[in-house]
Amino acid sequence: MVDGNYSVASNVMVPMRDGVRLAVDLYRPDADGPVPVLLVRNPYDKFDVFAWSTQSTNWLEFVRDGYAVVIQDTRGLFASEGEFVPHVDDEADAEDTLSWILEQAWCDGNVGMFGVSYLGVTQWQAAVSGVGGLKAIAPSMASADLYRAPWYGPGGALSVEALLGWSALIGTGLITSRSDARPEDAADFVQLAAILNDVAGAASVTPLAEQPLLGRLIPWVIDQVVDHPDNDESWQSISLFERLGGLATPALITAGWYDGFVGESLRTFVAVKDNADARLVVGPWSHSNLTGRNADRKFGIAATYPIQEATTMHKAFFDRHLRGETDALAGVPKVRLFVMGIDEWRDETDWPLPDTAYTPFYLGGSGAANTSTGGGTLSTSISGTESADTYLYDPADPVPSLGGTLLFHNGDNGPADQRPIHDRDDVLCYSTEVLTDPVEVTGTVSARLFVSSSAVDTDFTAKLVDVFPDGRAIALCDGIVRMRYRETLVNPTLIEAGEIYEVAIDMLATSNVFLPGHRIMVQVSSSNFPKYDRNSNTGGVIAREQLEEMCTAVNRIHRGPEHPSHIVLPIIKR
């Protein structure tokens, strides 16, 4: 029996296999016997529980309802011992922590996990460790392939904004974790705060690999991430994705259309859904905003994911899999999506949607597509004549990131108006005619472009945009391909200047109804900064080059019957 009261034990030290002790706080209900347990592994300070938990659940309700909650500082941070090296020790530490919990008299042998972002990644690491008592996980906005998200991406470009912003945040935690203050701590803290306040400025420093503060505080940032642009063995050794195929651990996966992890959240759902009770919730959210309210686009009160709703969903999921309450998820859909445009939630039976019609929309035009007032067109018919749109990509003047799946760029993520970049000559715009009927796009989006460049390496970007009758051009999803990685992320190969290549761009996913009076637009360019690092166009080691060593590229998008550049939209007709 549980009466709603609970006790707290702080800084209980849990031994790992190498003798390092990790600190946990125990929130235990006043119960007559052992209870199910929920574990959170947190690199952001377990004492600051309500700051990060507002993005997930009101977990104290779990405790009041009879669950014990264990919150742990990950290795090397705050009250835990050891050295913090991102991701490297987390699987073993999760396994050891779970084993310790299962040995405690107050645990009934059933453990679950929940949490957002890094806290979600630690759940996948725990799940693949194979500890039998882990009965369910609820990773929100997380990844099982850390190369593809958050540090690089499916196109091979460095997610420099995410890397520098997150590293600066972790750096502040490392400083405050120290038991003995150092003379340089105050100045270091101020510099880290400056990075967080101006990530674009920090990303503009060249060579990018010369980040003395981050390199000193978190050598992993340079040694593992920046200096390993290929998806090599060092990345594959910490990737979990290939191990998910046989995973039977039930998973409640939460994602956001404007979150940098959305592609990997959806990919992990597909990977585990056949062997486990996998549930998926996707809203119009970014990594730091679950309200559905943004400066350029408001989705209404229905888009807000209130803590209570998330808590209720999580509790039902854990009741089913930790307590064996078979009816706890009765009436709960396998997939729940927020469909933008009509701004409504919709229940689905699967992802991808079974009735998806993947439809090519071809780039065309009566003239040059440069700027939004150019002659670029978008239609389901291939243009009858061959043509090419040309622009200059200058790394010293990259196209600025406007909204989208940014993580730390001063909160400017989410559905942003793209009009501020429409007058740039290096932004090609291809638009449909004004729509007379609604067009629903729900699913993964990709582009197949025929491109050439004067450089031996460069980038190409593609962005899907909803153009409103009032002129707003709201971005929905986007992607990038680094030409050296056009064939494989493992073995880069440069291109021949002037030769035409067909490339695929993974633009992640969205769910949006383009309403009558709107237009569908595709924007193509060669940079999206600081979301991604700038390609130097030299074919060299980009992170080790000075800005003065970089060069301007003449880039072309070829279109027509011989080179049918197009975007593939997942059309839903109902």
Swiss-Prot record:
Record note on pH: Optimum pH is 9.0.
Applications (biotechnology): Because of the high catalytic proficiency of CocE, it is an attractive candidate for novel protein-based therapies for cocaine overdose, as this cocaine-degrading enzyme could be used for rapid cocaine detoxification in an emergency setting. However, wild-type CocE is relatively unstable, but this can be improved by specific mutations. Thus, improved stability of engineered CocE enzymes will have a profound influence on the use of this protein to combat cocaine-induced toxicity and addiction in humans. Also has a potential as a highly-sensitive drug detector.
InterPro entries named in the record: AB_hydrolase_fold, CocE/Ser_esterase, Galactose-bd-like_sf, Xaa-Pro-like_dom, Xaa-Pro_dipept_C, Xaa-Pro_dipeptidyl-ppase/CocE
Recorded GO CC terms: cytoplasm
Phenotype for residue 169 to K: Displays greatly enhanced stability, with a half-life of 570 minutes at 37 degrees Celsius. Exhibits 4.5-fold reduction in catalytic efficiency
KW Repeat (keyword) present: no
Keyword NADP: no
Catalytic activity: cocaine + H2O = ecgonine methyl ester + benzoate + H(+)
Stretch list, region 1A: 1-144
UniProt temperature dependence: Is relatively unstable at physiological temperatures since it displays a half-life of 13 minutes in rat plasma at 37 degrees Celsius.
Active-site positions on this chain: 117 (acyl-ester intermediate), 259 (charge relay system), 287 (charge relay system)
Localization per record: Cytoplasm
Positions that bind substrate: 44, 118
Enzyme class: hydrolase
Record site feature (Probably involved in activating the substrate carbonyl and the acyl enzyme for hydrolysis), residues: 44
Effect annotated for changing residue 44 to F: Loss of activity. Has no protective effects against cocaine-induced convulsions and lethality in rat
Chain residue ranges for the region called 3: 355-574
Effect noted on mutating residue 117 to A: Loss of activity. Has no protective effects against cocaine-induced convulsions and lethality in rat
Further comment found in the protein's record: This enzyme hydrolyzes cocaine faster than any other known cocaine esterase.
Subunit and partners: Homodimer. The protein aggregates upon heat inactivation.
NCBIfam families per the UniProt record, alphabetical: CocE_NonD
UniProt remark on domains: It consists of three domains: domain 1 contains the active site; domains 2 and 3 are involved in substrate recognition. Domain 1 contains the GxSxxG motif found in most members of the alpha/beta hydrolase superfamily.
UniProt name for this protein: Cocaine esterase
Organism: Rhodococcus sp. (strain MB1 Bresler)
Gene transcribed to yield this protein: cocE
